[in-house]
Amino acid sequence: MGNSFGCSASGERLVSAARDGDFVEARMLLDCNPCLAKYSTFGGLNSPLHFAAAKGHNEIVGLLLENGADVNSRNYCGQTALMQACRYGHWEVVQTLLLFRCNVTRADYLSGRTALHFAAVNGHVRCLRLAVADFIPSAPFESVNTQTNGDSSNTKSKHEQSGLSKFVNKAADGGITALHMAALNGYYDCVQLLLDLHADVSTVTFHYGTSMDLIGAGSTPLHYAACGGNLKCCQILVARGASCLALNCNGWLPLDIARMCGRHWLEPLLSPNSDLTIPMFPPSNYLSLPLMSVLNIAREYGLLSSATNSDEAEICAVCLERACTLAAEDFEPTIPHRR
């Protein structure tokens, strides 16, 4: 890999610069030897791109990619830079990686997690939304949803929705989906968005290989939400069709999980005989972003190339322009302007 270039000393300097966010040092090293962008450490096979993505150094990420770094390179765990950025919530980096057409559907070697799993487990809803940008047409949610549920014969749309469904419902080891993870950790925004993206509310973990022995195999996202204890997550799952009567392989209801985990405030909602009124939940506001159009325009016109100079003003996170022409308040609570 990288050490085959015979520049291990310079390569390690670039790794340090990428990790520490030293843009000047990174640019100097790459000006001298652009091949260093493909350098990787021996032990962990982590590239400078992995380090920069994990730390959120977006300008260095762009610099490395423009100098030939492989946007889909993996470390020893099989994780890509996109997974690292989603894991730590660096949505600006996710945006940059998408501009360079990273593969969002790849899964790591250790647990089979995709970028969606890494975003969902830590509640990074902006990263989650960006990761599905190429699957969602740039149209209002109501239009997209009507087209999906109606009698439209649009083959392209059906293909896009099929690809989106497969991606959103992709299971990691043990059958755990991104929805399971978001529900367990109580990230309502992620749960809401995943459900709007047609995540399967009734999907169950595998009967083998599950790492959540406390919850049990064959568990639904509602079982996981009951363990996590977030009332709002449980409410929206029930509102979207999750069954309070679903039994896992241990014969436990979501109510049983809630009791075992000490989540007694969930009992009135999860009781099979509950007569509580479930609130209505509107579609996620994050779906209103026309990200597919924005990304395609940026890719076509190469808007990223002007964003890697640290001495210039940063681009707007919404419209990808220097002088923003969009009103931030029109997109609340979506991706905000950087300050």
Predicted regions and their residues:
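Ankyrin-repeat-protein effector appendages
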Residues: 1-13, 130-160, 170, 197, ...
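Ankyrin repeat start-site detector
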Residues: 9, 43-44, 76-77, 110-111, ...
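Conserved ankyrin/ankyrin-like repeat signature
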Residues: 25, 59-60, 92-93, 126-127, ...
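Ankyrin repeat domain, specifically the short helix-to-loop turn at the C-terminus of the second helix
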Residues: 30-35, 62-69, 96-103, 130-138, ...
